Regions:
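Alpha/beta-hydrolase fold nucleophile elbow
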Residues: 149-162
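Alpha/beta-hydrolase-fold enzymes
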Residues: 169-252
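Alpha/beta-hydrolase active-site loop
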Residues: 128-149
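Conserved alpha/beta-hydrolase
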Residues: 102-122
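Glycine-rich nucleophile elbow surrounding the catalytic serine of serine-hydrolase chemistry
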Residues: 160-170
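The serine-hydrolase catalytic nucleophile loop
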Residues: 89-101, 115
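N-terminal cap/lid segment of alpha/beta-hydrolase-fold proteins
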Residues: 29-77
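Short beta-strand element of the alpha/beta-hydrolase
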Residues: 76-87
Length: 253
């Protein structure tokens, strides 16, 4: 319980920090690891938190991730570790990386990975966000980080952000390697995709299921992939979006 409280307290302090939302998509060109959050590491220095890009296989897919090691990291030591699951539509260089870096500053070995089919990770069709895959991604991060030099596998935690929070809760229900869990702005993807935001689409559930079925049939029979409409949304459409959550999400992701 003490460790759980620690993760939550650290996450809350990060969220309250000034400038946490002052992230720009233009920053990726200015950082050697394409990190876009304020205060991101710009170079690895002795005695400080360092970042280590890594890749590994998960069910035949190449996964791209960043591991953050705490100041004065000693590979022969025993450190608690935390993996961070990014939001729906997010990548490891955004808010997941921010929290991973800040938690490393608190003494943890941390990890943020691009989900399968997303970011720099492999998998087709691109941008697939399947709850079963996302849950498996979290287990895959645990597979990797528990073998990382210096990690105490008996002190493993997980932080899930937004959509990653919902997938995190699902993962820890059955994966008992995780000894602590915390979420931030947790988003129930299944409920919202089914019912709409705040139950705004209850009347169209069957219609949308038919659209999903037709899209799958088309992919199987013709090879053509139907992507969700948000992939081509225009700035003027974003400005007209009445729900703050979606409007700000379009801009950020």
């Amino acid at each position: 319980m003490k460790k759980l409280t620690s993760i939550i307290a650290i996450a809350a302090s990060i969220a309250a920090a000034d400038g946490i939302n002052a992230q720009s998509t233009e920053k990726h060109t200015q950082n050697p690891w394409t990190l876009v959050y304020d205060g991101a590491i710009t170079k690895n220095e002795p005695g400080k938190v360092n970042i280590h890009p890594v890749t590994y296989k998960l069910n035949g897919i190449d996964i791209a991730a960043n591991v953050y090691t705490p100041a004065n990291y000693d590979a022969s030591g025993k450190y608690p570790a935390i993996v961070v699951a990014h939001p729906n539509g997010g990548i490891k260089e955004q808010t997941a990386g921010l929290y991973a870096q800040r938690l490393a500053e608190a003494g943890y070995i941390t990890m943020a990975a691009d989900a399968s089919y997303q970011g720099a990770s492999g998998g087709e069709p691109r941008h697939t966000d399947n709850p079963a895959y996302r849950t498996e991604d979290i287990r895959g991060m645990a597979d990797f980080i528990t073998k990382y030099a210096g990690v105490d596998a008996n002190r493993l935690g997980v932080l899930g952000i937004c959509g990653g929070g919902g997938y995190t809760i699902k993962a820890v229900q059955t994966d008992k390697r995780f000894k602590a869990v915390a979420t931030l702005s947790m988003f129930n993807t299944g409920e919202v995709r089914r019912n709409g935001f705040q139950n705004s689409q209850l009347s169209t559930i069957q219609e949308r299921l038919k659209q999903a079925t037709d899209a799958r049939t088309q992919m199987v029979t013709t090879g053509k992939i139907v992507y969700a409409g948000v992939s081509s949304v225009k700035d003027e459409e974003i400005a007209k979006t009445s729900t703050d959550l979606y409007r700000e999400g379009y801009l950020y992701y």
